[in-house]
Amino acid sequence: QNALIEALVDSKQKDSFLLGMWALNRDNPYHSYLKVVDAEKLDNKSYHPGGCTPLYDKWVETLSANVTYAQQLRDSGTTVRSIAVVITDGQDYGSRQHTAADCATLAKDLLDSETFVLAMVGLGNHGFKDVAKDMGIPAGAVLEAGDTPSDVRRVFQLVSQSVIRASQAKVNPKSAQNNFFTP
């Protein structure tokens, strides 16, 4: 996560990025949308991996918050493109309000709007590609990675490159769904 923030801060487009950060195993976000230079970097005190992840509930909650904020920006005349990337082991533990089908319905609506890019990174080997498909995330926007520290660093570097490329309009939102992680 820190590598992602650093890459965005170092990009020429840093002033055009807002970053919201949620952990799927927490009730509250680390922070809502801030300029990337103000985004919180994680350390051993602020981030505690593990615990139960209500993946479907948190994905819908996070996307709903993004939709609301993006609409506020649009209403004020700001052009907005939203890129949401979930990094997960693909397991849902404890979702009580939403199912994978609910996620897929929301994903379809957002992708059809052509103002959203949705992507998933799966860490480890837990069948997350099927989960991503069930949640409506296009196959070209799904990345499989190991779960070692070097794998995780590589993933954040690739995510940051993909976000920067998408923000520079080198790919349009529709095609980004099919090749988000392709350089």
Go through the PLM ranges and name each one.
Residues 1-183:
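Acidic, low-complexity intrinsically disordered regions
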